[in-house]
Amino acid sequence: MKQILRKAIALILAVTAVLFPLAQTATLIRTTDSAKLASQIETADANSVVIKAAIEKHYDGDGWNFEPRTSDGVHITPQGDGMHLKGHPDEAFFVFEKTAALEFTAEFDAGWTYNSKYSYFFGNDSEAAEVKKLADGSVKFTYKVKKGEKIAVTELTAACVNATADALPRLDISIDCDFESVTKDEWVNAKISLQLGTKVFASGNYNGSGKVKGRGNSSWGYDKKPYSIKLDEKTSLLDIPKTKKYAIVASYTDSTLMRNYITYKAYQDLIGIDYVPKCEFVDVYLNGKYNGIYILVERISIEKNKINIAEADEDNITGGYLIEKNVHGRVNYKKDQVFDCPYQANQVKDHFVLEEPEIEDTELRREVLQYLNVYMQRLHNSVMGFSSEQYTEYIDEDSWVDFVIVQEISKNIDGNLKTSCWMYKERDNNKLYMTALWDFDLAYGIVNWSNADEERNDASDCPGSGTYEDFMIINSSCPWIKKLYQQDEFRELLTERYTCYRTTVIAELQALIPEQAAYLAKAEDANYKLWKKNFCLGVANLQTWLNGRLEWLDEVWLIEN
């Protein structure tokens, strides 16, 4: 019965999220009605880990220290009775012990304006909550509490004040020919400049030169095309660590423009995966013509600030190697350094591609690829139980656990060890490490298909990515993930890690959606006029889907204390 009630409440919350995008976990709320309180406990119980973490952070033994989340460009100043609410926790609720008014003022830096649509302040209780815009552009927030009343802990932590930027950074790329003639195969000389927008970056503006070419697999076929950039000199753009290698990702299939962005930003602090690409939003102009909002992101490579390993050489071919898992249709057999995949998740042959180092010597390349063939077969045998060697001798559990969690949260159809999956092997170390999360523009419920067809051997076991329920990569035809998940040690580490992340990086993932929606709210108007993508509906759908997905994963992975 409890699970049925939870699902019913989840459905109500999902509908609410479409109508009121910021009411993500707020359950209701300010009441002394015992029947209403009882109905909320079912939802609160499912969030007990989140609630416990919130109490530990905000309750000081005497009351609640109220701390609304604020975006860039926002500054909070307490007013009146301040930001401390006298009271005590009571299971999933907080009981006020004093009648008082919670008051603060939000001020905004130049170029930033308050976004009421993507901010949230006790939205389910309009009688007690007041948001008032003042003549000087600041906004005053007031919430009146009464002694003896209760409020859901999740409502106290849901408050956020988010602002919209007047302008995004502007990235100009100019070449001597039309961009229609640019291909994925040949670099074209380019003049490249970057002018900062409203958001402050210490790296400042940029004027320089480099090269550009097309990039992507299916994304290259869309009208809004992605590009790779190679600067002439290592440079920090938008505070991304110095590198020559950048890309601009079009996010054409993603009406929110942010699926890749929130993934890369939220997961910078993973425990097991030691590198996630850095990125920022930009307005892109190609030969002076506006082409929409893109994500400027550093390209994956072996570098000090990225994947910091020593490259293999002729004296030591055990590593290090940067490897991408890819499929038959996306491999260039003439140019790529290809070696075999021991399993067959597709009807045609699966492959690994050695991305770095690029080996010029033909004989050394042959020797290295043969070494990697043998290595991957030994790894496969250990994972599948075909040899006496343990999988822990070849699999770095910490990074693989993180990889599974991230891909399952997003139900990423490109993240099931078939394509766009990156890993590395260090020299004199047998373990394979997952790294560099990449390519989430078809994740988080954006499509209803799953890559489950006869060509990919998934027709019977891989669920649709549009649903909240079921596993994606664990149930896919890649046998490694499924086999690892069957190991008690791996599965226990995964559930412990998920429980830890539920109040840290996953909470950050959720909070980034309204925050970045507010940030892009003005800039996306021009993007909409060009590409006709419904941003607001996309944001609401993304929030609803992610909340539903986490509800299901909580039931199977969350460890209740």
Locate predicted features.
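Middle-to-C-terminal accessory/interaction subdomains
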Residues: 216-218, 222, 348-417, 421-425, ...
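Internal "kinase-insert"/substrate-recognition segments embedded within catalytic cores
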Residues: 235-236, 250-252, 272-277, 290-405
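N-terminal Sec-pathway targeting helices
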Residues: 2-11
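Structural recognition of the beta-strand scaffold that forms the well-ordered cores
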Residues: 226-230, 246-250, 257, 265, ...
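Hydrophobic core
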Residues: 13, 17-21
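Short, well-structured beta-strand/strand-turn elements
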Residues: 269-283, 412
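Beta-rich interaction/scaffold domains
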Residues: 26-160
